[in-house]
Structures are given as structure tokens and as C-alpha cells.
Amino acid sequence: PGAPVRQALIDAGIGEDVYGSFEDGMLQPMFSIVAKNADESDQTRFVQIIEETLQKLVKEGLNQDSLLAGINSAEFRFREADYGQFPKGLLYGLQCMESWLFDDTKPFIHLECLDTLQFLREQIKTGYFEDLIQKYLLDNAHGAVVVVAPEKGLNRAKEQEKKKKL
């Protein structure tokens, strides 16, 4: 229940693996949905399934338990501050840079997220998240479909060419 778009794409047989990512360390954040090893001819169906699934989520609402679980998980990670092999200070500095680059007055905003998590928790039953989907995903005119298609044997050909030169 936590990944309806992913599940819809998998159920439709698009790609061997489907995942999403969000990059917000830039002035214009970017959200992407990736279907690995998908058939190039499924581009239209890929977009259609995503749009239909998002429209259904906006209309019927997101699973509130999944939203709460996601927020709780984010809060747990924030409070634990377990970054594995990476020093906390280094990662805190990198988090500060993500906001500091674009607003000199708020370098610590990413380190002070408990109020934001509480706000998100309070919005679960209000349609807030569905409105975000509508505004930033469905009504966004700045989308693109990018196909990265490998050329079979390209590395082998480059290696042979390099051997000839050497």
C-alpha cells in the first residue's frame, strides 16, 4: 500500500524494477520515476499508468496509515542520526549546504525538521498530500520522458578499438 505507482507499473509489466527518486539539493527540485529494463515501446503506457494512478490517488485519497508510517520513519531516522560509516558532523554540514546555497538566512533549516514532521502529521486527514500530487505532479507542465537505451556490445567494441591503438 505504500507505493501504488510502483505497484501499478509492476502489475502492468513495465520494467524489471521500478523506483522513484527526489533530488532537492538544487534550486529546482526534480522527481523521477524509473523503470529499469523497460521496453521502449511502453513509453506512452508508462506515462498513462503513472497519470491514471496519481489521479486515482488524488480522487480516492492516499492510504493514511502509509503516510503516518512514512512520517514516523523519517522522524526515527532524524532522531537516531545513524549515518553508518559517515561522521555526523560531515553529513550535518552537507545538509546545511543544501539550504544555505539558496537562502543565506536559513542554513540550519534541514536540521530543524521536527516542526515540519509534526505539520505533515497534522495534514494527513486534510487532503494536503493529494493537493501536492495534483499541483506538483499532475498539473506540472515541465515533465519529460527520458529513455536511456544501451547499445549492446559497445564496451567490447571500445575495448577492441583501444587495444588496436595501443
Task: Mark where each language-model region is.
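M16 family metallopeptidases and their MPP-like homologs
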Residues: 6-123, 141-151, 157
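N-terminal leader/propeptide and maturation segments of large enzyme subunits in energy/redox metabolism
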Residues: 153-158, 163-166
